[in-house]
A protein has these predicted regions:
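Residue-level hotspots at or immediately adjacent to binding/recognition sites across diverse folds
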Residues: 1-239
Length: 239
């Protein structure tokens, strides 16, 4: 049998498979790594369903579970703090398999972050700041899917949309965050289509434009630790 397997690559050892959780059909995906590479997070099949995991060389792959209230599991880890002690992702709540963003710590386990008001219940965490205190992702809201920034002090706060992106079906999604949590990147509806953005508290959401030659579309996936370099994709004249 064969299946998708999470891996760790280093210059010394090349690509090394991380295995999978036990009990389910073999499948694992790595989606985040700590600052020094010692902690890897992702999701894998287990005996109860798809489950978020945290991997270390000492303890191998350990499932993080899900929200209580349902015998089955459907959770995934998407990001991890620099020291590997805080993991963020999405799980199924006891509210009828509705997705909720979570923040996991060794001390507190999985804690739900709620969602923005006004829409059907849904939220998803995609990235976390270096110290684990700021979480970003997307949530349903009264106006449509919307990127958010979460802290323990403020809770979940929507970041809005780019100018011209409010109608008829607005959306914005956050995908990356700088080390100190001050810069957030993602993509949003705009007057011409979908546009990558960079958000700061001072400037708000600022569109990054697109590559020339194709339909108007750009998407920011991640940002450097200092917030100055952003990567993603755009449609261009080459395809």
């Amino acid at each position: 049998n064969s299946g998708s397997e999470a891996f760790l690559w280093t210059a010394d050892n090349g690509m090394v498979g991380l295995g999978g959780l036990t009990g389910g059909n073999f499948f694992s995906v790595a989606s985040g790594v700590s600052g020094n590479g010692s902690v890897i997070v992702g999701f894998s099949n287990s005996g109860l369903g798809q489950e978020a995991f945290r991997w270390t060389a000492d303890n191998s792959m350990v499932g993080l579970g899900d929200f209580p209230g349902d015998p089955s599991i459907h959770s995934s880890a998407q990001g991890v703090s620099a020291d590997g002690t805080v993991v963020v992702g999405t799980g199924d709540t006891e509210l009828g398999h509705k997705h909720q963003a979570f923040r996991w710590t060794t001390a507190g386990g999985i804690v739900g972050l709620g969602d923005l008001p006004g829409g059907p219940f849904f939220s998803s965490a995609e990235a976390v700041s270096g110290d684990g205190s700021v979480v970003v992702g997307s949530s349903n809201s009264g106006s449509g899917p919307q990127s958010f920034r979460w802290t323990a002090a403020s809770g979940m706060v929507g970041l809005g949309y780019l100018a011209g992106g409010g109608n008829p079906d607005p959306f914005s999604y956050a995908g990356g965050i700088s080390a100190d949590g001050s810069v957030i990147v993602g993509w949003s509806s705009c007057a011409l289509g979908s546009e990558a953005f960079r958000w700061t508290a001072e400037a708000g959401m600022v569109g990054l434009g697109e590559l020339s030659g194709g339909d108007f579309f750009s998407y920011a996936h991640d940002v450097s630790g200092d917030g100055t370099v952003i990567v993603g994709r755009s449609i261009s004249s080459l395809g």
